[in-house]
A protein has these predicted regions:
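P-loop NTPase motor domains
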Residues: 46-49, 61, 65-67, 162-219, ...
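A short helix-turn-beta junction within AAA+ P-loop NTPase domains corresponding to the substrate/partner-engaging
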Residues: 280-284, 496-511
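Extended, folded cores of ATP/NTP-driven motor/assembly subunits in large transport
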Residues: 1-195
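Walker A (P-loop) phosphate-binding loop of P-loop NTPases
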Residues: 242
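Conserved lysine of the Walker
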Residues: 245
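Hydrophobic positions on the alpha1 helix immediately C-terminal to the Walker A/P-loop
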Residues: 248
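Post-Walker A helix-loop "phosphate-sensing" segment adjacent to the P-loop in P-loop NTPases
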Residues: 254-264, 279
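Hydrophobic anchor at the beta1->P-loop junction of P-loop NTPases
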Residues: 237
Length: 628
């Protein structure tokens, strides 16, 4: 009486599902097409959503225009007459009704509108037990009631309502039966059009990282897809600790590696170590990095300015060198290369500057000699016997072009800011050169995690260099993903020029959970950056660890969408950047386990019941597959 039972047979087993139907009891007071999806998946109140498979059906028939026009005329004349008698004193609403019917008859007479008979029904499918059915019923009734839609269950008539969701059934006498039962509503065509069950969520790309929308629609993220009106493939990600940044980015890295491309990750905190080892990548600690600015040069005319810029940033991280400094430095770079080519060192550059300072050429130019002496002092720390000489005068640089994945852990350099700036800029130059030298159909990815620390450059030259690199990477199928903990690190007056350049030149922007206090301050300073709905939505984002999924806002140029990312327990273990998880894996590695075995044990430790259910499901389906 209160439901239908559907019998199914799958893999040699019988199973049943329960079918529940609900239809509209009366016309809603107000309805908008853009708000219709909130009836079954409310953005701000996710608990007001339908959590089971369902079919929402709108069956409509446009009534005869002449008949409805005549009906409107009669109705208007009757109400208009009553409104001018004592009847209106007892029923004050009659004047409003007369006005509405008068306007309706004008629209009907001019052909601007029509009267439509319609039947709105929702058919839900759930497990065949009373407890689940009651939960589904309450979900549906409460979700629609939130927006002013009153639904009722068709007692003893579930089969009739169920048939309406099947194709071509309404025209075979079923709609007439619905009319006779009094469950068909009437409204103007405009109002009925606003009841259409449309979901406007964008599926984004045909394939890629699966990230369902908040409306529970399939959506995929592929930053290299060309159909999103994006001007580049770069992505900026910001979210507080525990928001799920690492779990979101690591699948993107895997997709690039699986396509045959390469990825380089700048990290602080060993967050990508497990993934690197699982994927057979190269893991390098910042303390062991070795560079040589002249190592990969083949044409000094094309590379001289790049090396000059690198040495300029190393000499003055805050960007205090002027054009004369840089002109002299360019001469030193060219002279060093012409003398020793790839065997040239920073010592050769400093020697050239010393000889120039002592030469007769600048004997009468104390200003020039002063600049030469300044650069000699600033670059001395990077010579072979200088404080940081071991990092920049290597015969065999640490970075090799044959590695598909390289993770560079730079946390050990954080307490030496000058060295960190020099290393970071050298790495960015290396990445850009590798992107340019490899085939353009090969996907390339550079991930800069903890960008608020790694991109904290005061030197405007670094910002300009990053902006240029971010803009030109698209031509070589390259992408930069920059990650910070707070949107202020990207988009505020406090952000460095490099961070602002990364934000401004990223077509993809992902906003995860934010610090409530910091986000409120940001919205006060920049009230036009986010709409009220977006602020409320971001404020409701939870921690990925607590809710078992990541919530985020994806912005691609002017398009915005809301997504959730669900990750299986094995991937969660591999992607985890939590301290205890990291120590667990490292301890298992010391005990002799492989990285795969260590991650497997961590997955069982963190998500035992989930892993057990997945294994049981796999064994069951493998058994039936072998029987078939």
């Amino acid at each position: 009486a209160d439901y239908l039972t559907l019998g199914l047979r799958e893999n040699g087993r019988n199973s049943t599902a329960r079918i529940l139907n609900f239809h509209l009891a009366r016309n809603p007071e107000i309805a908008f097409l853009w708000n219709m999806a909130d009836n079954y998946s409310n953005l701000l109140n996710p608990e007001l959503s339908i959590s089971c498979p369902f079919i929402l059906t709108l069956t409509l028939v446009v009534e005869d225009q002449v008949k409805t026009h005549s009906e409107a005329n009669l109705k208007y004349m009757d109400l208009e007459k009553k409104s001018k008698t004592s009847y209106a004193k007892w029923f004050p609403s009659v004047e409003k009704e007369a006005k509405e019917w008068g306007e309706l008859r004008q629209r009907l007479g001019s052909g601007q509108s029509s009267v439509v008979s319609y039947f709105l029904n929702i058919t839900a499918f759930c497990k065949d037990n009373n407890e689940t059915a009651l939960e589904v019923e309450q979900d549906i009734l409460n979700s629609f009631r939130k927006n002013g839609f009153e639904l009722i269950s068709p007692r003893f008539n579930h089969m009739r309502n169920f048939l309406t969701c099947l194709p071509f059934m309404a025209g075979k006498g079923l709609f007439k039966q619905l009319k006779e039962a009094g469950v068909v509503q009437r409204a103007e065509s405009f109002n009925v059009a606003n009841l259409m069950p449309l979901v406007a969520d964008n599926p984004l790309t045909p394939a890629g990282l699966l990230a369902p929308t908040y409306r529970n629609q399939l959506a995929f993220i592929d930053i290299f897809f060309r159909g999103m009106n994006n001007t580049n493939y770069n992505m900026a990600v910001c979210g507080t600790s525990g928001a799920g940044k690492t779990g979101l980015i690591q699948p993107l890295i895997r997709s690039v590696l699986d396509s045959g491309g390469f990825a380089v990750v700048f990290d602080m905190g060993d967050g990508y170590k497990s993934l690197c080892e699982n994927m057979g990548g190269v893991y390098l600690d910042g303390e062991t990095l070795r560079f040589n600015p002249f190592a990969n040069i083949t044409d000094i005319d094309q590379s001289a300015e790049r090396v000059r810029d690198q040495l300029s940033v190393m000499a003055s991280p805050n960007g205090n060198l002027d054009e004369v400094h840089e002109g002299l430095l360019l001469q030193a770079v060219r002279a060093s290369w012409l003398a020793k080519e790839n065997r040239a060192r920073i010592d050769d550059v400093v020697d050239f500057l010393k000889n120039a300072s002592d030469s007769e050429q600048y004997a009468g130019s104390p200003t020039i000699r002063s600049r030469l002496d300044e650069m000699i002092v600033l670059l001395d720390q990077y010579t072979a016997n200088g404080t940081y000489g071991q990092y920049f005068n290597s015969d065999e640089p640490s970075l090799r072009d044959d590695a598909k994945m390289v993770v560079l852990e730079l946390g050990g350099l954080e307490d030496r800011p000058s060295l960190l700036v020099a290393v970071m800029f050298s790495l960015i130059i290396y990445i850009e050169n590798r992107m340019y030298r490899t085939p353009r159909n090969l996907k390339k990815l550079n991930v800069i995690d903890e960008g608020w620390r790694l991109l904290d450059f005061k030197n405007h030259k670094v910002g300009e260099f990053i902006e240029k690199g971010y803009r030109t990477a698209r031509r070589h199928t390259g992408a930069y993903i920059t990650i910070t903990q707070n949107i202020v690190d990207f988009d505020s007056d406090k952000a460095s020029s490099a961070a602002r350049a990364a934000w401004g030149n990223s077509s993809y922007k992902i906003i995860l959970r934010q610090s409530a206090k910091e986000f409120a301050k940001y919205n006060q300073l920049y009230p036009d950056q986010f709409q009220p709905l977006q602020r409320d939505m971001i404020g409701k984002f939870g921690a990925a660890k607590d809710q078992w999924f990541s919530s985020f806002l994806l912005q691609v140029e002017n398009h915005s969408s809301w997504h959730r990312l669900f990750v299986d327990p094995l991937s969660r273990a591999m992607y985890s950047s939590d301290g205890p998880d990291f120590e667990f894996v490292q301890q298992k590695r010391k005990e002799g386990l492989s990285i795969h075995e260590a991650v497997w044990q961590l997955a069982w430790k963190k998500s035992g019941p989930e892993m057990a259910s997945l294994e049981a499901w796999l064994e069951e389906h493998e058994k039936y597959r072998s029987v078939a």
